């Protein structure tokens, strides 16, 4: 079909010439049966969900257990982000850096243009306008995703400010990020569709200079919901580098003291380190309260007062289900229980509720994430996929801070970096200054937790928890962090801390109880900000003693707390060659400031012997 004969192209609800030309160009290439413009309304959402139920993609859940909620089971080949098929196609290879896959942008465009040719036959091309962050921000970050997946359209309504209001914000000539997505599964006339169409060939490609995202072959999560990691981190980090701000893989937490003073904390953790649990913290210390601003992404820029302010660009939670329960994260469970959730790859109970590993009450029988019968104590495989998800509106979170969508953001008092380390890294360490804090973030690592991820216990470096999400060279990224610190007075900058909830004793048990008790560790950090708490200087930074922490009412062996806080110089000397290996991998763009911090650490460790 020519553009002139594709229904829906000529009655677009916008006069934005650049957008109209792009939609027309994509429609001529991909050959959909029709073009539709998503308006973000409840009516549209309900209609598309009903359509997905009819197609077999969604199962409607028991309205008494999960109101207005649905379960989707993906193709077993399409269950997670695919780092090996994710590309940063900068003009020069050096600008992608050693942590990213790179291909020449012209070559990549050629490959993908061939794949996109006719790829939407038999389907609807959806035009999905959206905004990351509040619509009334001074500089709203707008985007348009073109997709042939209704699953994507309904999920984007939950995860972003999507629809007519975002389109209106673009006006007739406003800038927007072009995000093109196809599942790569055209339908011939009369061909029966499958419940989860996708393609074995997958590309998730970013063009940082032109601020474009091209994704092909996957219908799942971060590969397909292009506002999430693709825009909010990979493209936004390139924007932030050019414009003097930070786009980070961080939760934003509001802590309120007994004196009713609010402190905002941004925290970066690699996967499986409890980011969502901390974002929805329930403090155990009397008088302290916590509220949620965001659980995954923080955009930070300086305010007029010289402080660093953070906004959460997202509109929903896209959380990992397994391990989430009424004990580990009651606030996430309350958010989900309010309804309006799309679950993907969890298990289905006999009464059409959902279940996953770690959830209370193990049923005798389930339909697992592959659609097979699962029988308690007989079936050896997991009922829910380890990366199964819930997609639910942030507005339903009972601990949501009222200012979560303030376009000015919230002023950050502390930045935490944290990993999963059995040894070496203390419960909390305060950086000496901003540059030392950047060094701590640059060397952040987590031990591998399963043999499939690599050798168990091997430390995988994940700088600022951004390893899979950097839109440009990691060395330039470290330098950008250092430069950000030079834009403000040191006294105005957030203090930087390094935390490790996961240290273990010689017998393998956790030394610190974690979860809500982590509020005791955060209290010390706040007292350091207020110059009210002591700490001792060590080769790696300032570390509290057990006496410096508020342990009142905590049933824990004082010797365990001492061990959790210990700085063992021999363990740190063993860490030095691991850091050296990582910095060699970063290569020639490793900033001088980071090298200076590393040299200073080695000197302090030598003096400590």
Curated annotation (Swiss-Prot):
Query: Which UniProt keywords are present, listed alphabetically?
Result: Cytoplasm, Decarboxylase, Gluconeogenesis, GTP-binding, Lyase, Manganese, Metal-binding, Nucleotide-binding
Entry-linked InterPro entries: PEP_carboxykin_GTP_CS (IPR018091), PEP_carboxykinase_C (IPR013035), PEP_carboxykinase_GTP (IPR008209), PEP_carboxykinase_GTP_C (IPR035077), PEP_carboxykinase_GTP_N (IPR035078), PEP_carboxykinase_N (IPR008210)
Question: Organism's domain of life?
Answer: Bacteria
Q: Which GO terms describe its cellular component?
A: cytosol
Q: What does this protein do?
A: Catalyzes the conversion of oxaloacetate (OAA) to phosphoenolpyruvate (PEP), the rate-limiting step in the metabolic pathway that produces glucose from lactate and other precursors derived from the citric acid cycle.
List of residues binding substrate = 81, 220-222, 271, 387-389
| Protein family per UniProt | Belongs to the phosphoenolpyruvate carboxykinase [GTP] family.
Organism encoding this protein = Mycolicibacterium vanbaalenii (strain DSM 7251 / JCM 13017 / BCRC 16820 / KCTC 9966 / NRRL B-24157 / PYR-1)
GO molecular function per UniProt: GTP binding; manganese ion binding; phosphoenolpyruvate carboxykinase (GTP) activity
Pathway entry: Carbohydrate biosynthesis; gluconeogenesis
Bound cofactor: record note: Binds 1 Mn(2+) ion per subunit.
What PANTHER family would the database entry show? PHOSPHOENOLPYRUVATE CARBOXYKINASE, PHOSPHOENOLPYRUVATE CARBOXYKINASE [GTP]-RELATED
Query: Which residues are annotated as active site?
Result: 273
Which cofactors go with this protein? Answer: Mn(2+)
Give the gene that encodes this protein: pckG
Does the keyword Metal-binding belong to this entry? Answer: yes
Supply the CDD domains for this chain.
PEPCK_GTP (cd00819)
**Where would you find this protein in the cell?**
Cytoplasm
Q: What reaction does this catalyse?
A: oxaloacetate + GTP = phosphoenolpyruvate + GDP + CO2
Residues recorded as binding Mn(2+), renumbered to this chain, are: 229, 249, 296
UniProt name for this protein: Phosphoenolpyruvate carboxykinase [GTP]
């Amino acid at each position: 079909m020519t553009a002139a004969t594709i229904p829906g192209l000529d009655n677009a609800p916008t006069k934005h010439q650049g957008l109209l030309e792009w939609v027309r160009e994509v429609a001529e290439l991909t050959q959909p049966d029709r073009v539709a413009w998503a308006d973000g309304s409840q009516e549209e959402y309900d209609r598309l969900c009903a359509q997905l139920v009819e197609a077999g993609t969604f199962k409607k859940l028991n309205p008494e257990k999960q109101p207005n909620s649905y379960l989707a089971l993906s193709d077993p080949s399409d269950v997670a982000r695919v780092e090996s098929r994710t590309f940063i196609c900068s003009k020069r290879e050096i600008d992608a850096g050693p942590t990213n896959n790179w291909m020449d942008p012209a070559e990549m465009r050629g490959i993908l243009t061939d794949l996109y040719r006719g790829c939407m036959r038999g389907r609807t091309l959806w035009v999905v306008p959206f905004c990351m962050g509040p619509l009334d921000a001074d500089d709203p970050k707008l985007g348009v995703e073109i997709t042939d997946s209704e699953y994507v359209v309904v999920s984007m309504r939950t995860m972003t400010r999507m629809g007519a209001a975002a389109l209106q914000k673009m006006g007739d000539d406003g800038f927007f990020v072009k995000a093109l997505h196809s599942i790569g599964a055209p339908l011939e006339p009369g061909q029966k569709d499958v419940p989860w169409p996708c393609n074995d060939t997958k590309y998730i490609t970013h063009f940082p200079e032109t601020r474009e995202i091209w994704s092909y072959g996957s219908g799942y999560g971060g590969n397909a919901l292009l506002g999430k990691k693709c825009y909010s981190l990979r493209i936004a980090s390139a924007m932030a580098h050019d414009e003097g701000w930070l786009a980070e893989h961080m939760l934003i937490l509001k802590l309120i003291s007994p004196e009713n003073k609010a402190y905002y904390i941004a925290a970066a953790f690699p996967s499986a380190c409890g980011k969502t649990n901390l974002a929805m913290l329930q403090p155990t210390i009397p008088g302290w309260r916590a509220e949620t601003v965001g659980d995954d992404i923080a955009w930070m820029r300086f305010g007029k007062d010289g402080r660093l302010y953070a906004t959460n660009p997202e509109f929903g939670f896209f959380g990992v289900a397994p391990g989430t329960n009424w004990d580990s994260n009651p606030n996430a469970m309350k958010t989900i229980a309010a309804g309006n959730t799309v679950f993907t790859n969890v298990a289905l109970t006999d009464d059409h509720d959902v279940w996953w590993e770690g959830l209370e009450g193990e049923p005798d029988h389930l339909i697992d994430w592959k659609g097979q019968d699962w029988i308690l104590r007989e079936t050896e495989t997991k009922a829910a996929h380890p990366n199964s998800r819930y997609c639910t509106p942030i507005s339903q979170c009972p601990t949501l801070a009222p200012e979560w969508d303030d376009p000015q953001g919230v002023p950050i008092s502390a930045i935490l970096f944290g990993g999963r380390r059995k040894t070496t890294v203390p419960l909390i360490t305060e950086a000496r200054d901003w540059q030392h804090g950047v060094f701590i973030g640059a060397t952040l690592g987590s031990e591998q937790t399963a043999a499939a991820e690599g050798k168990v216990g091997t430390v995988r470096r994940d700088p600022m928890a951004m390893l899979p999400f950097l839109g440009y060279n990691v060395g330039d990224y470290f330098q950008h962090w250092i430069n950000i610190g030079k834009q403000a007075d040191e006294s105005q900058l957030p203090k930087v801390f390094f935390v490790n909830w996961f240290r273990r004793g010689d017998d393998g048990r956790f030394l610190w109880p974690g979860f809500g008790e982590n509020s005791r560790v955060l209290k010390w950090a706040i007292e350091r900000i207020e110059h009210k708490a002591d700490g001792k200087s060590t080769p790696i930074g300032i570390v509290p003693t057990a006496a410096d922490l508020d342990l009142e009412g905590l049933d824990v062996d004082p010797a365990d707390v001492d061990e959790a806080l210990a700085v063992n110089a021999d363990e740190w000397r063993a860490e030095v060659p691991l850091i050296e290996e990582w910095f060699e991998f970063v290569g020639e763009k490793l900033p001088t400031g980071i090298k200076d911090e590393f040299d200073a650490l080695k000197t302090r460790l030598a003096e400590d012997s």
